[in-house]
Amino acid sequence: VLQRWATKELTNLLDHKLPPNIHLQYQGLDLSLFSGSLKLQNVALEIHNKDTASVSTKLNLDQLDLKGLSYWQILINKNIKLGTIKLISPKVIYQPSLKAASKDSVAGSKSEKKFPAKLNSISLDHLVISDGQFTMMKKTGDSIGLSLSNLNITLDDIKSNKEIIQNKIPLKYANGTMSAENFYADISPLLDVRIGSLNLKNKTLDLKEVALKTKYSKEELSKVITSQRAYLDLKIPELSIKDFDYGFHGERFFTTITEISVNNADLLVYRDRRPPDDMRYKPLYGTLLQHLPIDLTIAKTNVVNSKIAIELLMAKASES
């Protein structure tokens, strides 16, 4: 009887009592009070922007498994304690909002974050995401800004409470691993980055088949630019980032790296000298590094067995 009542109440909650900007569909729900487990199958979730009603996030999920919910911790200690959450084959599409943040919302982001009033803490032994896909669209919504596939993530000993949630990173975890393939990022109107595979484990990030390349061919670039711009084609078969760490010093984000190793890099720089120079002020790289919006520390960089080629297309004497 209790099992049927709990299943009915949970179904009613998911079907009718979620916030109006959250739309959830699923085909199968399996709840076990005895083992503290929940399984949802063929999940489709949409989160809409409250101000525009447009869809900001879509999630399709083959299966969600939750195991090891401790009722004793909830009832006696007011803690939510979970064993394992597994997300199987999640596919996420995120659409950033075109609307700029208002002054009120920016100011509100610095206000105290609210933890569930009747709870002391939330903890999770293991979070497992397997065979995921993530796509972030550009703000205009007409093209992809970032994407990756075969995403696998594990996090252990995750926790949050009234104090931790006030931090810039509102949770803590002990160990984590991450791997993915087919990474793509549109980083500027002329450049994109592609990475064949990436793997993060024990604070070491290994990248394979890294490519930074101009979106146009040499000939096409010459047709679209109005002043001189370099054509870039950088290939790095293997790149390793060791002792990678990150966090916040107060309000400022930091990243520290003990060593970056680059093997067999091949860089081609091509410049068509026929268009006019861009005479606008352009700060040197040293100045740009001094004014980064984050604190970046790289102790050592190794570049091995690599080459750089520079090609110039000069204007003919009759054209000058």
Question: What positions do the PLM features span?
Answer:
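Short, intrinsically disordered, charge-balanced linker/junction segments flanking boundaries
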Residues: 316-320
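Extracytoplasmic assembly/pore-lining segments of large envelope/extracellular complexes
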Residues: 307, 312-313
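Flexible, surface-exposed loop regions and adjacent strand-edge segments
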Residues: 99-107, 275-281
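Short coil-to-helix leader/linker segments, especially the first N-terminal amphipathic alpha-helix
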Residues: 20-21, 281-283
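A short secondary-structure junction signal
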Residues: 140-141, 314-315
